[in-house]
């Protein structure tokens, strides 16, 4: 069997290479390396118009919704906090559509940091825009340019618990977190100060969001679990069928991966 195709959401940023300064699709290489080490074939997905989403979902075997800047607070009916990043509306719209389409298609997905926030907001949840206001400290992002490492407690009854066990040390850097949890999501990991560190979509083959950055650490188990789920997922339906309710995926695609 060939490597399953793992789509990784990217963003558009001004970038310089050789003599050029152009808008480019940007993604930290740690994401692609993590997917490769786990046995997948990574593909970076730029923010594209909504009518391209069904075609993308039909061609990938799993989705990684990557980290990045804060999402637009108006998407969960709040005004922006003074510490909230200026939003990237194009990426926000694209990733919400992608995560909803992945859910409809029962496509395995892993949502990381900002990606977990996208998942929560796509399911009607809300965010804490600036954790220090709630916690009284910057313990979850003590350095603006470096990851910190902290402990998380994991529900052993969850899919994530079956991958990681009851506890883990994880690399993280965030000033926002889940507040009200979205419909169908279940919190499955927490820090000692009770910040939600992971959620799972109930009834989904593999639908996990984590607040930390597994692509930055040495523990490959989450990516290995995602790739394993992608290998066993039914083949993708035709693009026109993706936006409906969960549908049967064609055997032709499955044969192409054999």
Provide a role label for each language-model segment.
Residues 1-110, 120-121, 128, 132-163, ...:
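N-terminal beta1-alpha1 cap of cysteine-dependent amidohydrolase-like domains
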Residues 113:
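Conserved G/P- and acidic residue-centered "switch" motifs that form tight phosphate/ATP-binding loops
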Residues 207-212:
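Active-site-proximal beta-strand elements of phosphoester/diester hydrolases
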Residues 116-118:
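Hydrophobic, aromatic-enriched interface-forming segments
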């Amino acid at each position: 069997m060939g490597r399953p195709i793992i789509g990784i959401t990217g963003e558009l940023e001004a970038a310089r290479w050789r003599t050029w300064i152009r808008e480019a699709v940007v993604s930290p290489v740690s994401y692609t390396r993590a997917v490769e080490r786990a046995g997948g074939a990574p593909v970076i997905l730029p923010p594209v118009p909504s009518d391209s989403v069904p075609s993308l979902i039909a061609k990938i075997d799993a989705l990684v919704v990557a980290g990045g800047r804060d999402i637009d607070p108006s998407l969960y009916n709040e005004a922006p906090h003074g510490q909230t990043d200026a939003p990237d509306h194009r990426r926000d719209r694209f990733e919400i559509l992608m995560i909803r389409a992945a859910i409809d298609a029962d496509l395995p997905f892993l949502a990381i940091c900002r990606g977990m926030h996208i998942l929560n907001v796509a399911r009607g949840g809300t965010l804490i825009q600036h954790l220090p206001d709630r916690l009284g400290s910057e313990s979850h992002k003590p350095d603006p340019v470096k990851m910190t490492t902290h402990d998380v407690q994991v529900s052993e009854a969850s899919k994530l618990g079956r991958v990681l066990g009851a506890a883990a040390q994880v690399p993280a850097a965030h000033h926002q977190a889940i507040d009200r949890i979205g419909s169908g999501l279940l919190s499955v990991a927490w820090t000692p100060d009770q910040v939600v560190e992971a959620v799972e979509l109930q009834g989904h083959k593999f639908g996990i969001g984590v607040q930390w950055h597994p692509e930055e650490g040495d523990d490959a188990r989450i990516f290995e679990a995602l790739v394993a789920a992608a290998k066993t997922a039914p083949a993708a339906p035709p693009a026109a069928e993706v936006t409906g309710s969960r549908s049967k995926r064609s055997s032709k695609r499955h044969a192409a991966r054999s």
